Curated annotation (Swiss-Prot):
Miscellaneous comment text of the record: Heme 1 (or BL or b562) is low-potential and absorbs at about 562 nm, and heme 2 (or BH or b566) is high-potential and absorbs at about 566 nm.
Intrachain disulfide bonds: none
Binding positions (a ubiquinone): 201
Protein name as catalogued: Cytochrome b
Cellular-component GO terms for this entry: mitochondrial inner membrane; respiratory chain complex III
Gene expressing this chain: MT-CYB
Native source species: Mirza zaza
Cofactor binding, per record: Binds 2 heme b groups non-covalently.
Described purpose of this protein according to its UniProt entry: Component of the ubiquinol-cytochrome c reductase complex (complex III or cytochrome b-c1 complex) that is part of the mitochondrial respiratory chain. The b-c1 complex mediates electron transfer from ubiquinol to cytochrome c. Contributes to the generation of a proton gradient across the mitochondrial membrane that is then used for ATP synthesis.
The keyword tRNA-binding appears for this protein: no
Length: 379
């Protein structure tokens, strides 16, 4: 009798995706982050669902409903902090996942890569709207500043901003619609993840060498299920250390003050995972130029396959490309730091230099270095 997991219509899909899936035998721990992102998404949906049971999307009661969750709901404080810090874990895994794709040349799997970029934008939109919901000072002013950026669009900008606000300022209508979108988007993300995996399983995974691995495949279970489980334990350890020892480490103290349209906080800044893009936005004096640079800072990932000039897919045997990759990583850390600093000397000029370097590295320097390495292969 044939095994039920290979015959049952539903279990057959699960089997071909997670059990009998042929996987390269040499994929390293950098390949763990896909499954960790899946775990983060599950954690966020579950904790978010419980938070939504007690939260009220109304300007008069939103802030107090979050306080009520933390003080009066059984284990409400831990659910709230797992959700808030879970978002940080989500983005940490996302950035490493994208970085892994760049380093090992996974962007050559263009369908998977492009769906991944759409996923990145969707997750960023979800996180932004989620940050508005507690209706603290930084929630309100963050929503005001970021939505206002759309007014830079010629001709239709102002109308578009008022349409998103549902009025002439960020108010009850804005909060209600942001809650609705924040609730529905994770399910759209889940659907996109399935498409992401569908395209990945069409081609099979890349591996650290960047070579074809058809001649040397192993079943996903038990090898990579156990490996992913170990990665998950490390993720949960890090998350719970953050939640139980310093839950407000990555948050902003201003968000413990209820939203007040009459008082502007001294430094309006988003959560840490948006700071690099925020620094690029601020480094350009022109509003429309800043918005375009902000969008391009992520959208630039889509043209990576076109910028590939190397004969080797992975950076493993390309030391100069490795140096450029880690320079880019350091540049992103610099941009993240600058995004959290006030707009004054010397932070402005550092931000501008780091922004120019960011685009230069991806568009000019890295493809040029790859060409030089190609010529070095002939020597």
């Amino acid at each position: 009798m044939t095994n039920i997991r290979k015959m049952h219509p539903l279990m057959k899909i699960m089997n071909s995706s997670f059990i009998d899936l042929p996987a390269p035998s040499n994929i390293s721990s950098w390949w763990n982050f896909g499954s960790l992102l899946g775990a983060c998404l599950a954690i966020q949906i579950i904790t978010g669902l419980f938070l939504a049971m007690h939260y009220t999307a109304d300007t008069a009661t939103a802030f107090s409903s979050v306080t009520h969750i933390c003080r009066d709901v059984n284990q409400g404080w831990i659910i709230r902090y797992i959700h808030a810090n879970g978002a940080s874990m989500f983005f940490m895994c996302l950035f490493i996942h994208v970085g892994r794709g760049m380093y090992y040349g996974s962007f050559t799997l263009s369908e998977t890569w492009n769906i991944g970029i759409i996923l990145l934008f969707t997750v960023m939109a979800t996180a932004f709207m989620g940050y508005v919901l507690p209706w603290g000072q930084m929630s309100f002013w963050g929503a005001t500043v970021i939505t206002n950026l759309l007014s830079a669009i010629p001709y239709i900008g102002t109308s578009l901003v008022e349409w998103i606000w549902g009025g002439f300022s960020v108010d009850k209508a804005t909060l209600t619609r942001f809650f609705a979108f924040h609730f529905i988007l994770p399910f759209i993300i889940t659907a996109l993840v399935m498409v992401h995996l569908l395209f990945l399983h069409e081609t099979g995974s890349n591996n650290p060498l960047g070579t074809t691995s058809d001649s040397d495949k192993i079943p996903f279970h038990p090898y990579y299920t156990i490996k992913d489980l170990l990665g998950l334990l490390f993720l949960l350890l890090l998350l719970m250390m953050l939640v139980l020892f310093s839950p407000d480490l990555l948050g902003d103290p201003d968000n413990y003050t209820p939203a007040n349209p009459l008082i502007t906080p001294p430094h309006i800044k988003p959560e840490w995972y948006f700071l690099f893009a925020y620094a690029i936005l601020r480094s350009i004096p022109n509003k429309l130029g800043g918005v375009l640079a902000l969008i391009m800072s992520i959208l630039i990932l889509a043209i990576l396959p076109l910028l590939q000039t190397t004969k080797q897919r992975s950076m493993v045997f390309r030391p100069f490309s490795q140096i450029m990759f880690w320079t880019l990583t350091a540049d992103l850390f610099t941009l993240t730091w600058i995004g959290g600093q006030p707009v004054e000397y010397p932070f402005v000029i550092i931000g501008q230099i780091a922004s120019i370097l960011y685009f230069s590295l991806i568009l000019i320097i890295m493809p040029t270095v790859s060409l030089i390495e190609n010529n070095m292969l002939k020597w």
